[in-house]
Amino acid sequence: KSEGTDMMKSISVKIRKGAMAYLKRQYKTVGIFFAIMFFILTVLAAKRFLSPFVPCAFLTGGFFSGLSGYVGMNIATYANTRTANGVRDGLNKGLKIAFASGSVMGLTVVGLGLFDISVWFILLKFVFKLSINDVMTAMLTFGMGASSMALFARVGGGIFTKAADVGADLVGKV
């Protein structure tokens, strides 16, 4: 679908650049948290309090959650002007574009999560022949990594959105 007028395309590029700059900064900050958590989990695994697979499961959970966020941000910024342009031809067309782009994001999150947890299950249960308790511990840690990344994205996204709202209010008043 078309991105619309030249003005819409220009605004879209600026939004996309700002969103990607935000995401890059956020992922650098979250990377520090993940490095610290990986170190802590590795120490616990070395002392045999945890399975040696737990630190890697935590990292892959965070990685796939972050990848979902990156894909979602790209889809959202590309669909933004296409949806606005579609609405010019009727609400139904704009709704279809928005629904399709939102569906892609939802399926990406579920697909990446299912892929990662399936790989972990197959590796741990059938390749390394671990007990089901050890497999479940690693899978729960995968979920902890994914949830940690999602939490940072949620909190950071709320702050980013509020800053954008304040900026829009200031522009509207000036």
Residue ranges of each PLM-predicted region?
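Hydrophobic, small-residue-rich transmembrane alpha-helices and their short perimembrane loops
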Residues: K1-V174
